[in-house]
From Swiss-Prot:
Family stated for the protein in its record: Belongs to the cytochrome P450 family.
Name of the coding gene: lnaD
Catalytic activity, EC: 1.-.-.-
GO biological process: secondary metabolic process
Major place of residence: membrane
Pfam family, one: p450
Residue ranges crossing the lipid bilayer per the database entry: 9-29
Name recorded for this polypeptide: Cytochrome P450 monooxygenase lnaD
Keywords per UniProt: Glycoprotein, Heme, Iron, Membrane, Metal-binding, Monooxygenase, Oxidoreductase, Transmembrane, Transmembrane helix
Length: 511
């Protein structure tokens, strides 16, 4: 009996394995025979499997395919580690892509593919969550001027600890990513929860561990696990996320409870922070219902913690680009002088970050060269009858679409010498005042996709741009940093582009 059961288990397991390994070929067969493929058309099940497995090694298929097809206004398909192919549209079809309604091409369904929450937390209501994200980040953007004093206070505190306090003028070697991690997390937690929690080492530890574990599991399940295995692997991968959710609920529950009481009684003015905005929104949506604190905390952790790592990576790329640029061009000094003037002439009626066009252009250039994903504008075909593209190509329901962002950003038809780092590329001159001006960092277009484009552009991009300008400007004004000999090459994991995490820099406090 035991032997028979074992044999049945082996047969079922073998059948499942064969099915999983055949999935790349099934994906190929779903698409029209006229579809172009990069780097080659799968010639059979083993060929499709090999092309999919190749993507695990950080292949730049989307960028190379862009050069071969998209520059000729042709779409193409590539295999993925998830064993489900993706169709990449040329830039000429971006306006059409953005014009399609949600019930035809779904951004939300594609978003589920990217963050894998339906697999990691099946009971999580993603649609209510997305509405909350938009509302909360609107509050965050609107309150940028009101939070600048707290921002600068925490910026001074964290940089003193990490890079050196006034009077400490000795050169020191620090890990760039670790330093930015401490500075940026400190600032964000100060704005989200206030000074007491932002400097509570145990709380900060749990926040960082939760962020890293959740981000890693999202990337792993969404981009590296074959799609038939996602439901099972996702549930297992979600266990550590639930554990840290419980730890964070224990820490944050008293703060949320106190804030609910404050807003309901209206006896005191609550702090202008993320907790207040979130509780206020929850109460305004359902004035007569009880606010479920644990649910709010779970949503908050996803809204504000995970994007902090994105901000760290963008700032990391900025410094890697700047420090590896030609010292003779004196980009560092030009940005320092601009930042010194902005901080010295601070006008409390508007953010400091509004008076730094050179910084604006330099950040935008780093985002152009190093977006954090090689594909943007993801959509999933959800219309039952499929969809016909502007060039007449038909795609069945379930097809995953995107645009090769790195290819768009490095297209010589749009950008002169696109592979060259030109930090002041986006500068121009005001025709009336003759002063320098720059395209704002958060402004998206069909040629600049670092934050996406259209109505689903990253809702936190205005705060991210403001934060980067203040943090970078303050560091440039107060610290000397030795140049890097060459720019460390970013890594590619699935569709995600990650800066090198082990780069050491030499830094000292200025007199």
């Amino acid at each position: 009996m035991a032997a028979s059961t074992t044999a049945q288990i082996l047969v079922v397991s073998l059948g499942l394995l064969i099915f999983v390994l055949l999935c790349p070929w099934f994906g190929y067969l779903r698409l029209p025979s006229s579809m172009r493929w990069w780097p080659s058309i799968p010639s059979g099940p083993l060929s499709a499997l090999r092309l999919s497995l190749k993507e695990y090694s950080g292949s730049r298929s989307s960028e190379d395919g862009y050069k071969a097809f998209s520059k000729k206004a042709e779409l193409f398909a590539i295999c993925n580690p998830s064993f489900y192919p993706q169709v990449l549209l040329p830039p000429e079809q971006i306006p059409w892509l953005l014009s399609q309604p949600e019930n035809v091409l779904s951004h939300e369904k594609a978003n589920e593919d990217v963050h894998a929450l339906p697999f990691l937390a099946p009971a999580f209501d993603n649609y209510d969550h997305l509405e909350l994200i938009r509302a909360i980040r609107t509050d965050l953007t609107r309150n940028i001027p009101n939070t600048e004093d707290a921002f600068l206070d925490e910026l001074r505190h964290t940089t003193n600890e990490v890079l050196g306090a006034p009077g400490d003028n000795a050169w020191k070697e620090v890990n760039l990513t670790v330093a930015l991690d401490s500075i940026i997390f400190g600032i964000c937690l100060r704005l989200f929860f206030g000074v007491s929690l932002s400097r509570n080492r145990t709380f900060v530890y749990y926040v960082k561990i939760f962020t890293r574990v959740t981000g890693a599991m999202m990337l792993f399940v969404s981009q590296l696990v074959p799609w038939p295995l996602k439901p099972v692997v996702g549930i297992v991968a979600g266990f550590p996320i639930y554990y840290y959710w419980v730890r964070l609920i224990i820490y944050l529950y008293p703060t949320f409870k106190e804030r609910i009481q404050c807003l309901r009684t209206k006896k005191e003015t609550p702090p202008a922070d993320m907790v207040t905005w979130m509780v206020d929104l929850a109460i305004s949506q359902n004035p007569t219902r009880k606010v479920h604190i644990s649910s709010l905390i779970v949503r908050l952790t996803l809204i504000v913690f995970l994007p902090v790592d994105v901000l760290i990576a963008m700032t990391d790329n900025f410094f890697l680009d700047l420090l590896s640029s030609d010292p003779d061009r004196k980009y560092y000094n030009a940005l320092r002088q601009e930042a010194e003037a902005a901080f010295t002439n601070r006008d409390k009626t508007q953010p400091i970050s509004q008076s730094m066009p050179y910084m604006e252009s330099t950040i935008r250039e780093s985002l152009r060269l190093s977006p954090l994903s090689d594909r943007m504008l993801s959509r999933r075909v959800v219309h039952k009858g499929g969809i016909t593209l502007p060039d007449g190509q038909f795609l069945p329901r379930g097809t995953w679409l995107a645009v090769a962002a790195v290819g768009v950003h490095r297209d010589e038809r749009t950008y002169e010498d696109p592979d060259e780092y030109r930090p002041f590329r986006f500068l121009s001159e005001d025709t009336e005042t003759k002063e320098a001006k720059a395209m704002l960092v958060p402004v998206t277009s069909e040629k600049f996709l670092a934050f996406g484009h259209g109505r689903h552009s990253c809702p936190g991009r205005w705060f991210a741009a403001h934060a980067m300008k203040l943090i970078i400007g303050y560091i440039l004004v107060n610290y000397d940093i030795e140049p890097l000999e060459k720019r460390p090459v970013n890594s590619v994991v699935g569709q995600t582009i990650i800066p090198q995490l082990d780069v050491k820099i030499r830094v000292r406090r200025r007199e």
